[in-house]
Structure formats: structure tokens, C-alpha cells
From Swiss-Prot:
Lineage: superkingdom: Bacteria
Pyruvic acid (Ser) PTM positions: 63
Pfam family, one: AdoMet_dc
Annotated site residue numbers, Cleavage (non-hydrolytic): 62-63
CC cofactor: pyruvate
Cofactor note: Binds 1 pyruvoyl group covalently per subunit.
Stated role: Catalyzes the decarboxylation of S-adenosylmethionine to S-adenosylmethioninamine (dcAdoMet), the propylamine donor required for the synthesis of the polyamines spermine and spermidine from the diamine putrescine.
Name listed for the protein in its UniProt record: S-adenosylmethionine decarboxylase proenzyme
GO biological process: spermidine biosynthetic process
PTM per Swiss-Prot/TrEMBL: Is synthesized initially as an inactive proenzyme. Formation of the active enzyme involves a self-maturation process in which the active site pyruvoyl group is generated from an internal serine residue via an autocatalytic post-translational modification. Two non-identical subunits are generated from the proenzyme in this reaction, and the pyruvate is formed at the N-terminus of the alpha chain, which is derived from the carboxyl end of the proenzyme.
Biological or metabolic pathway of the protein: Amine and polyamine biosynthesis; S-adenosylmethioninamine biosynthesis; S-adenosylmethioninamine from S-adenosyl-L-methionine: step 1/1
Family named by the database record: Belongs to the prokaryotic AdoMetDC family. Type 1 subfamily.
Length: 116
């Protein structure tokens, strides 16, 4: 069976408040993640909420990577969507563990656009 896209939904719980509020760090971490996945960034958008929180999007040649933070809830939501299954979710979690402080991770893998 063939699919148009592969969507990885990552929820991180028990995140470090100070790290979530460091938007420069989160932006660099997101860009490094894109490079680690061997994707090309073609556009980016970032927004800092007040008093806290952050959303960011990288449009990559293969689709997109987004992040949303809720420091007050110690939570990060990350979505990675690509037109091919070109990455291993275990490697992404290992990368996140190396670069972010969190207590729990939940991952959902979704196959999108079934082609008959």
C-alpha cells in the first residue's frame, strides 16, 4: 500500500520551563532537527506569545516541521510531516532527549493520503 505522506505527532510532557522560554534555543534546536533529518529548509516562521509560549514552523522541501510550547503546562507539541518515510522516529526521540529536558514522550505515527 502506498501513501502520500507520513505524519509524526510528538507530545512532550514535564518539560523544563526555563528551556521552553528560551526561544533562541528552541529555534536553533528546531533547525538542527531539520538538518539531522537531512531536509532542506525553504521557509520559516516563529512567534513568541506573551506572557509565555512559542510557536514555530519550518517549511521543508519534503513538507513541514512545527513546534508549539506551553511553558505553563510544561508541554511541547511537535509535528513532522513529510511526503516520504525518510526518518526513523526512534532517532528523532533520541535527538529530542539530547536537546530538551522532559519526563514523558508520546508519539503517534499517521500514514496520510492512501493511494489505491
Amino acid at each position: 500500500m502506498k501513501y502520500s505522506g507520513y505524519h509524526l505527532v510528538i507530545d512532550l510532557f514535564g518539560c523544563n520551563f526555563d528551556q521552553l522560554e528560551n526561544t533562541e534555543y528552541i529555534i536553533e534546536m528546531l533547525k538542527k532537527l531539520a538538518r539531522a533529518l537531512d531536509t532542506k529548509i525553504v521557509a520559516k516562521a516563529f512567534h513568541k506569545f506573551h506572557p509565555q509560549g512559542f510557536s514555530g514552523a519550518l517549511i521543508i522541501s519534503e513538507s513541514h516541521i512545527t513546534i508549539h510550547t506551553w511553558p505553563e503546562d510544561a508541554y511541547i507539541g511537535i509535528d513532522i510531516f513529510t511526503c516520504s518515510k525518510c526518518f526513523d522516529p526512534r532517532k528523532i526521540v533520541a535527538y529530542l532527549k539530547e536537546n530538551l529536558i522532559f519526563k514523558k514522550v508520546e508519539i503517534k505515527e499517521i500514514l496520510r493520503g492512501k493511494i489505491d
